[in-house]
Design a protein with these regions (language model features):
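C-terminal functional extensions of proteins
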Residues: 159-212
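Fold-independent oxyanion-binding glycine-rich loops
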Residues: 54-57, 97-99, 133-136, 156-160, ...
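Short, acidic Gly/Pro/Ser/Thr-rich loop/turn segments
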Residues: 59-61, 101-102, 162, 180
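Alpha/propeptide regions of enzymes that mature by internal proteolysis
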Residues: 21, 25-43, 47-50, 108, ...
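Active-site loop/lid in soluble adenylation, ligation, and acyl-transfer enzymes
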Residues: 1-79
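N-terminal charge/polar-biased segments
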Residues: 1-7, 80-90, 204-212
C-alpha cells in the first residue's frame, strides 16, 4: 500500500517524535512546495514559446499572497494589449497563469496546451494564441474574456501546492464571462499533473466538453 501512494503514511515514530526519515522527507516536501509558490516563470521560457504575456496589478509574489484582490484585476494598458492582439476575437481564449505554482506551468504546459488547442480547432472552434497571465487569480479570466469578446475562456492555473505535490494545475472554463460572473458559473478540472489527471487526458476531456 505504501508503494502505491505518495501519501504520508507508515512513516514510523520513536516515542512521540517521527522517524528521522519521515521528518527529513517532510522538510524536503515543505521546501519544494514553498519554493514553487515564490518561483517566477522565466521570461526565456515564455519567449521560446512565443507567448504574449500580460500581468495583473500585482507587482511581486509577496503582494500576490497578501492582496488576492489585485490578482483579479488587470491594468487598462494590459487589457488594451489583449484587445489589439486578439482581433478578430476567437471563440475560445486559453489563458495560462502561474497562480500558486510555477512548477505546474513548467511541468504541464507543453503537454496540455497543444492538444487542447488542436482538439478545440478540430471540433470547429476558432482558438486564439495562448496567453500568459502573470500573478493571476481565477477571476481575472472574466476580465480577459470580456475584453477580448470571446465565447469561452479556459484558464490553466497552478494550484496551491501540497506536501509532496507541487505540480498540480486546474482548468477553469467559463462561458461569456463578465464582471458579474459568479464562481458557480465556472466548470473545473482539477488535480492535473502526471500522478493525477494526466495533462493530455485533461485536454481530451476539455475539448469535447466545449463542443457539446
Amino acid at each position: 500500500f505504501m508503494q502505491s501512494t505518495g501519501a504520508r503514511i507508515g512513516g514510523g515514530a520513536y516515542g512521540t517524535r517521527p522517524s528521522t526519515t519521515a521528518y527529513l522527507r517532510f522538510l524536503a516536501d515543505h521546501a519544494r512546495s514553498k519554493g514553487t509558490v515564490f518561483r517566477e516563470v522565466p521570461e526565456e521560457w515564455l519567449l521560446r514559446r512565443g507567448m504574449l504575456a500580460v500581468q495583473t496589478l500585482v507587482e511581486d509574489k509577496d503582494t500576490y499572497l497578501t492582496r488576492p484582490d489585485l490578482g483579479r484585476v488587470l491594468s487598462e494598458a494590459s487589457l488594451q494589449t489583449v484587445r489589439e492582439h486578439y482581433r478578430p476575437a476567437p471563440q475560445v481564449l486559453i489563458v495560462l497563469s502561474d497562480g500558486l505554482s510555477t512548477d505546474a506551468v513548467l511541468a504541464n504546459a507543453d503537454e496540455i496546451v497543444p492538444p487542447l488547442t488542436n482538439g478545440l480547432r478540430q471540433a470547429g472552434f476558432t482558438v486564439g494564441d495562448p496567453l500568459f497571465l502573470r500573478y493571476g487569480r481565477v477571476k481575472a479570466e472574466d476580465r480577459l474574456g470580456e475584453a477580448v469578446g470571446c465565447d469561452v475562456v479556459l484558464m490553466l492555473v497552478g494550484e496551491r501546492p501540497g506536501l509532496g505535490q507541487s505540480e498540480s494545475m486546474s482548468c477553469y472554463a467559463v462561458y461569456r464571462p463578465t464582471a458579474a460572473t459568479l464562481e458557480s458559473d465556472r466548470s473545473v478540472i482539477s488535480n492535473i499533473h502526471r500522478e493525477g489527471t494526466p495533462p493530455v487526458e485533461a485536454a481530451a476531456s476539455t475539448a469535447p466538453a466545449k463542443s457539446g
